[in-house]
Amino acid sequence: LTRTGNFTNNSATVTLNSDANEFATIKVGGSATGNITYNRWVNAIGTNEWDLIGSPVDGLSISSFASTNSSPLATGGGSGGNQYAIGYYDNSADDWTNYTTATIGDAGNFDIGKGYQMGTDSGATLAFTGTIATTDQTQAVQDHSGASGRIWNLVANPYPIYLNANTNADGSNNFLTVNGTTTMHDTYVAIYGYDADGSGYSIYNNTTAATYIAPGQAFMVAADNASSGTSVSMTEAMQTTTGGDDFISGDNMENTEVVVKLFNGDNELDSTKLFFDEVLTLGLDPGYDAGHFDDNAPIMTRLVEDDAGYGMAINAMGLDAMENAVIPLVINQSAGQEFRINLF
């Protein structure tokens, strides 16, 4: 749904629906008055299985959200004791905290642009009711890796509409270009989307086909080295009605890439990607190279030139590197453990 002018809802019910694969959208060209309800799909909770979600509407109380969604929202045994399956990430301590029956009343409103962990009993939609954000939004991010924390920050799409993620979605009005190295760490200019089955993070950057961020989808970004912090921006110019799943990629890129997978028996432990394009270098190409989310991942590579000690999940190089470069490979496995490497 696209509204070129102002949006006003005096008393009617305006509802947008989603399921595990598709998300309704609304785009407002002017101001917005009155509430909408976005029924946002959230996966079932399990061992290490959470969805990372942000509110696609503004002005929503966390306690009223928990009350409205008391049936599908996992609680008690599903999320532990007296906890709700709504939590936040504190990167200063690398810690996840769920709201409880004792703390939910003082939780305040959802901070749009901030991500939260959520889970439902068996996979269902949760109702978010509030106003539509019609201006550019920012979310503070900070690097706490110098102390007991981490570089990672959980942010989210604050709009009830998709956002362009990378240059293949839109050449300039996309999340990576707008934020880039001024906000994100040079080695991690990428979007790290959590796989809800608990297997880890998928990485989306400019080596990925056109990618779009679904309404209310949360993801990790790495702040730059400034401990004083900065902010990432989500802008109206990034908005698009194109999209599908939580993170949706278009057709395969017309470039050369190799995926190196590490196996123990038939069990795939992890993988790392080599990407080749004539405009890239053997050193760091921000937005194309991407460090691994886990510093001790089972398999990674290192930059061929100007290696600063980061394990790479995506190593992007020029086309001539396919024949001439020696690419350092890092494997973290216990002594005596059998493994094999396959190229795809």
Description of each model-found segment:
Residues 11-17, 24-26, 60-63, 67, ...:
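Generic marker of "main functional regions" within proteins
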Residues 14-18, 36, 66, 79, ...:
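Intrinsic disorder/low-complexity signature
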Residues 16-18, 54-55, 87-89, 119, ...:
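Beta-strand-rich, repetitive solenoid scaffolds
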Residues 16-18, 25, 35-55, 238, ...:
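Boundary/junction segments of secreted and surface-exposed precursor proteins
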Residues 41-44, 55-87:
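Conserved "landmark" site that anchors the functional core of diverse proteins
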Residues 41-58, 147-163:
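Amphipathic alpha-helical packing elements
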Residues 79, 90-111, 117-344:
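Compositionally biased Ser/Thr/Gly- and acidic/asparagine-rich
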